[in-house]
UniProtKB/Swiss-Prot annotation:
Stored Pfam families: Anticodon_2, tRNA-synt_1c
Main localization of the protein described in the UniProt heading: cytoplasm
Name of the protein this chain belongs to: Glutamate--tRNA ligase
EC numbers for this chain: 6.1.1.17
GO biological process: glutamyl-tRNA aminoacylation
UniProt motif 'HIGH' region: location: 8-18
Organism from which the protein derives: Solibacter usitatus (strain Ellin6076)
Binding site for ATP: 242
Gene that encodes it: gltX
Signal peptide boundaries: none
């Protein structure tokens, strides 16, 4: 049985690190014919936001990776409290009546300056029950066996054997004084109830796994296999952070720039995982076939970006490769949100630019002249061909007008007509094509000329060439 879960908290936009975690869980589930679970961990009421939750669902929808079961943590509070009660009944937790917020704090233990409150830990069960029955607020803390030799141990599927002494783990909170479960309790209760077999999550949670192993054992639940993923790092050596690195870590940024979902999945999958055959461009089906936890690296993965180029060079290369491999009709549909034309026109344009774009949004700069009636201003010197002058350019364009007025307006017909015209003028074909290209596109670098002329149509081409003649 292979059951895995992705459990985001709706407290911010979908981070590319979170997206990678989802991808690895999804690939693992599909590779083993298992179950993929989406669980929204929304018990931190003060930090949750509808916008964040929308971002998560929008991002996952864009990736196009499905899930089999869906849950919301806040709807499972009775389950969390039942586990807390069971652990308390076994004597493996105690009530902490420390006033104000001190009893809720888990930060002090993380700093290594606090392990437990002796007065609360040693309170008799009778006294604890009496104070609780009287309505005195309390936090519930796990009773870590500090008086025992030994350690919490488990084998991580990525990082290997792990151990932490009992004396190095604080009595962490299970319930806050308002009765709400902490992250540790809610996650363990849900993972146990949902029969999660493997917890695949970021390496930043590795330190939490010791506490979670204690909870699973105390509750009499089977501990899932842990597999912690290497961190995603920025070029500056810092962990990728929403706060520090901004939009570059948001899935939305990649979507809006024009990454294909399959290329983005391919890129993220290679940040910390290596397929056996060392190939880089992979289809979704190939990734499912090849994915194993054994292929995950321990070394942190770097996402390379700069202020000038916000996207990793490998991400851009992979996106371009996936764009080139797509059927032109499918690519045309992907390009539609970025252009002001209908599908019929985009189907004509796409084969001309498919080899020239790295991002879907590049269509706006590579093919902009298809989308306007009037070209933006350009320097008339651009019309002059190599080893030519303005007079040659003008003669070429006048001849082109005559030829295009009657030529068969197809790729092959236009090529035959313009090559014949260059021969008549006694010039090289390139000297004929260059002025025509600039006249109809507004620049020297453009998609293949004859296909471009065909898509623009006779009327637009003649009008643009006529305007170019007036410039000379």
């Amino acid at each position: 049985m292979h059951r895995v879960r992705f459990a985001p908290s709706p407290t911010g936009f979908l981070h590319i690190g979170s997206a990678r975690t989802y991808i690895f869980n999804w690939l693992f589930a599909r590779h083993h014919g298992g179950t993929m679970i989406l669980r929204i961990d929304d018990t931190d009421v003060g930090r949750n936001s509808d916008a964040s939750e929308t971002s998560i669902f929008d991002g996952l929808a864009w990736l196009g990776l499905d899930w089999d079961e869906q849950y919301r943590q806040s709807e499972r509070l009775p389950l969390h409290r039942a586990m807390a009660d069971a652990i308390l009944t076994k004597g493996m937790a105690y009530r902490d009546f420390t006033p104000a917020q001190a009893g809720d704090s888990e930060k002090s233990g993380a700093q290594g300056t606090w392990l437990f409150n002796a007065g609360m830990r040693e309170l008799s069960r009778e006294e604890s029950d009496r104070r609780a029955a009287a309505g005195e607020p309390f936090a519930l803390r796990f009773r870590v066996p500090h008086d025992r030799e030994g350690s919490v141990q488990f084998t991580d599927a990525v990082y290997g054997e792990q151990a932490k002494g009992y004396g190095d783990i604080e009595d962490f909170a299970l319930l806050r004084s308002d009765g709400m479960p902490t992250y540790h309790l809610a996650n363990c209760a849900d993972d146990a109830d949902l029969r999660i077999s493997h917890i695949i999550r970021g390496q930043e949670h590795l330190s939490n796994a010791f506490k979670h192993k204690l909870i699973f054992d105390a509750a009499g639940a089977e501990s899932p296999t842990f597999a912690h993923l290497p961190l995603l790092m920025a070029p500056d050596g810092m962990k990728l952070s929403k706060r520090v690195h901004g939009p570059v870590v948001s899935v939305t940024t990649y979507r809006d720039a024009g990454f294909l979902p399959q290329a983005f999945i391919n890129f993220l999958s290679l940040l910390g995982w290596s397929p056996k055959n060392d190939r880089e461009k992979l289809s979704r089906e190939e990734m499912v076939e090849l994915f194993t936890l054994e292929g995950i690296n321990r070394a942190n993965a770097v996402v390379n970006f700069t202020e000038e180029e916000p996207f990793d060079a490998k991400a851009l290369w992979l996106n371009a490769e996936h764009i080139r491999a797509m059927p032109a009709a499918d690519l045309a549909r992907e390009l539609l949100p970025f252009v002001p034309v209908d599908l019929e026109k985009m189907l004509q344009i796409t084969p001309l630019i498919q080899e020239r774009i790295k991002l879907l949004r590049d269509v706006q700069s590579v093919a902009d002249f298809f989308f306007v009636k009037q070209l933006p201003p350009y320097d008339s010197a651009e019309l002059i061909p190599k080893k030519g002058d303005a007079a040659m350019a003008k003669n070429v364009l006048i001849k082109a007008c005559d030829v295009l007025a009657t030529a068969e307006f197809t790729h092959d017909g236009l090529e035959v007509a313009l090559r014949a015209a260059s021969a008549e003028l006694g010039i090289k074909a390139g000297q004929m094509f260059e002025p025509v290209r600039v006249a109809v596109c507004g620049r020297k670098t453009a998609p293949p000329l004859f296909g471009t002329l065909e898509v623009l149509g006779r009327e637009a081409c003649l009008a643009r060439i006529g305007q170019a003649i007036e410039k000379l």
